[in-house]
Amino acid sequence: MDRCDFLPVSAEEMHERGWWWYDALVVGGDAYVDHPSFGTAVISRVLEAEGLRVAVLAQPDWHDAEAFRAMGRPRLGVFIGAGNLDSMVAHYTAAKRRRSEDFYSPGKRTGCRPDRAAIVYCNRAREAFGPDVPIILGSLEASLRRFAHYDYWDDSVRRAILFDAPADLLVYGMGEAATIEIAHRLKKKQSVHTMTDIPGTGYITRDPSVCKFDHITLPSFEDVRDDKRLYAEATRTEYAEHDPVRGRAMIQPCEGRYLVINPPAMPLDTRELDRVADLPYTREWHPMYEPLGGVPAIEEVRFSVIHNRGCFGGCNFCALAFHQGRMITSRSHASVIREVEAMTHHPLWKGYVSDVGGPSANFRHPSCRQQKERGMCPNRLCLAPTPCPNIDADHSDYLTLLRKLRQIPGVKKVFVRSGIRYDYMLCDDNDAFFRELVRYHISGQLKVAPEHCIDTVLDYMGKPHIGTYERFMDEYRQLNNKYDKEQYVVPYLMSSHPGSTLSDAVALAEYLNRRGRQPEQVQDFYPTPGTISTCMYHTGIDPRTMKPVYVAKTPHEKDMQRALLQWRRPDKRRLVIQALHEAGREDLIGFGKDCLVRPMTDRRKPAKAVEPQPPQRKYGKVYGGGKKPAAAHSAQNAKPGKSAKPGRAGKPGASGKSGGKPGSKPGRSGAKGGRR
């Protein structure tokens, strides 16, 4: 791929284009990958399509403002994003340990972006260009930290990010419409300080009367910092008003100034989404990364397609609804087909579309017909704990799209690897999509997210009850048998979510043990900014009901809950026994079929000594004495309802979990969805 196919990343590349000035500098916390799954690529291509000269500054040296001045002063402004993930999530695990790899950096190298990248980049840009160059802050990190928020890594409530990042405007959500509007006004020489009427943006002011929208005042930063009940009330209001149809602006006082968050922008319609998707992305990393081994994050999404936006799933631990919104919009069939046809000409194309998905793969239209006039229901989830009677569950359009993609010349297989909402799928009276999903679109494993088996915990999570998952699994097995498929389910499970007690974790381990499931990896609850579950973790209050909720906070209890879901691992044995003792479930320590672990006092008897036998000569060869070891064949991971094939173990992950989020490849708080 030639450098001229990308936007310029240096003064030299600008000069090769004959540019001696440029309009917009796009700063990103990830390596520059020109693919529609990467926020820097999307915003830079959107600005380019508006006729602007755009330069990209990816993962700059944040220690020196000179790195920001390397391409000169932009004529219009600086557009800053921290990357596809919150930088703290990208750098640290749920146990607050530093990650050893960064898939969004060249060669998986760590240390290519600072902690709290949005704040650091904004301060360096202001130092580099002074007060006269407008700075526009966006990306997931800024979006989810737009209000005063609990920060897990500091274990404290921080101010809204604009009070620490000296940007003139904050763009939250997906941001294309607001970014285009800001760029047009800057071209017309309008002062950025007068742009107070753009939906999907926020700013700081000393005079709250400048707000152009109907608004509501939230508890101040000082109040939510000092009073957990007020924090929970503020969270409830923030979610209730996050609606582009009926939502109001929100004002939050902070230390003598005021944060103003305007109502959300309307989601892009089909025509607008198609326009963004049809921009000339190269779908590759910039050639400057070749000597470093490229950027690994592209491997999972290079030949994937995002066909929708928004998520009405309502998972309380997921930030996607607070970022993208709950309204679903989707691309046209023609746009998706054009993208896949273009993929078939890529030099690395092997014939496989790795995913046709999004935050939730099988959402393609609004959840009900009332949303366009009334907005989303403020006090009702569409799917949990039971589906709303008004839900419009119809997969026919998605199924038609998949059928068309299968017919494109050069396409061998079209897979669906994003999370499937099985509860929504079961609401559809027509099972044609379910049948064809099993028959044509699973690459060996289907990702679903039951998360837990205890209904009270699932209610805190915003997930359907376990009976729905069991019904799905029964139908899934039947369809696999019908089509003679050996395909598995990868169930995502979560430990230590607010509301989950040690006894609940024991019950989940029992549930898995009885069904022969052995999850290999389990996601411990990660209190990321902006979610309802994080509010529960910090306050011990469910903001939806304002009632107390149990929270596992000590590292030891969190380790025990996680260990219980991996009870077969030898390194977890001691923790599992401790957990069972604390839960009063010593009956699960022993040798019975329902027991989880053996007692620690158990020691295998040493093998009986055998006298060595003299070598035996046979047909010119020497054989040692004793028996030859028999080949071991394991059936523990065999497909449910079938025996393991002779001489072949069942596939690993047949009934367990593989993979985890966030911080992995594009996902849990990134542009595409993870847990569903």
Regions picked out by a protein language model, each given a short descriptive name:
Residues 1-21, 31, 229-304:
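N-terminal [4Fe-4S]-dependent radical SAM core
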Residues 63, 193-242, 256, 265-268, ...:
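Terminal amphipathic helices with adjacent charged low-complexity linkers/tails
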Residues 26, 42, 61-62, 342-490, ...:
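Conserved SAM/AdoMet-binding glycine-rich loop
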Residues 27-32, 292-319, 352:
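N-terminal pre-triad scaffold of radical SAM enzymes
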Residues 604-676:
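Intrinsically disordered, Lys/Arg-rich low-complexity segments
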Residues 12-13, 39, 58-254, 261-262, ...:
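Glycine-rich beta-alpha loop elements in corrinoid/cobalamin-binding modules
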Residues 86-95, 144-146, 176-181, 205-209, ...:
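Flexible glycine/acidic-rich beta-alpha junction loops that bind and position SAM and/or redox cofactors
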Residues 24-25, 69-70, 198-201, 290-291, ...:
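Flexible, glycine-rich loop/tail regions that form catalytic "lids" or insertion modules at the edges
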